[in-house]
Regions:
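N-terminal Rossmann-like dinucleotide-binding module
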Residues: 1-31, 154
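Beta-loop-alpha module in the N-terminal Rossmann-like domain of NAD(P)-dependent dehydrogenases
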Residues: 2, 32-90
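Active-site phosphate/pyrophosphate- and oxyanion-stabilizing loops and adjacent acidic/basic residues
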Residues: 4, 26, 41, 64, ...
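Short, well-ordered coil/turn segments that N-cap beta-strands
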Residues: 12, 48, 71, 96-99
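Conserved acidic residues
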Residues: 15, 48, 123
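Conserved SAM/SAH-binding loop
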Residues: 38-41, 129, 170
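A contiguous active-site-proximal alpha/beta segment in oxidoreductase catalytic domains
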Residues: 80-137
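Rossmann-like dinucleotide-binding domain that binds NAD(P)(H)
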Residues: 134-183
Length: 183
């Protein structure tokens, strides 16, 4: 999806693609352009900005490698699977003078703009997300995979600091939480 979007932006050039699955990289390149890099090292030498859309458990190591090479990063959410890893990436980006942006795409959903126009000084917001089990992002639970969007939107709408959150999650289909509730 990232390659498709970049290919539609006039001011962006999709220069290179790297995927550990070379066939997937070839398919993306044939659809949207860009050179297929044979290694991550070759890829890093070709680009200025990188989209990281890998399993969350790899974000810190990949992010640190890219930031140490002074590459700007759009990293899929969540930024990391622990707050320590997230803070390490934020600190390194600042130290290197690089942009580190987390892909909270729901912030740019036109529906959110409509909600903002109608919602002035909210006192209570309740969000429910019901969906079939996605069979994706198996290295993290539903909170970091999907609920993070809902929490980010609520924080954006409320525009105040969090005082407290009460939450519970349970594993049902996997070893990580599949069902979660936060208040």
């Amino acid at each position: 999806n990232h390659a498709r979007i970049y290919s539609e932006i006039d001011s962006a050039d999709l220069v290179a693609i790297y995927d550990s699955d070379n066939d997937a990289a070839q398919k993306i390149a044939s659809s949207y352009g860009g050179k297929v890099a044979k290694s991550i090292e070759e890829f890093v030498d070709l680009v200025d900005v990188v989209s990281v859309s890998t399993p969350t458990s790899t974000h810190r190591s990949i992010g640190e490698m890219l930031l140490n090479k002074r590459k700007h990063i759009l990293i899929e959410k969540p930024i990391a699977d622990t707050t320590d890893d997230a803070q390490a990436l934020v600190n390194l980006a600042a130290e290197m003078g690089c942009v580190l942006q987390v892909g909270h795409i729901e912030r740019f959903n036109p529906v959110l703009g409509e909600i903002e126009e109608r919602l002035k000084d909210p006192r209570f917001i309740e969000v429910h997300r019901l969906s079939p089990f996605p069979n994706r992002s198996m290295d993290i639970g539903v909170v970091l995979d999907l609920m993070i969007h809902d929490l980010e939107i609520v924080l954006h709408l409320v525009k105040s600091k969090v005082v407290s959150i009460d939450a519970v999650g349970v594993p049902v289909l996997t070893k990580r939480e599949d069902i979660a509730n936060a208040r």
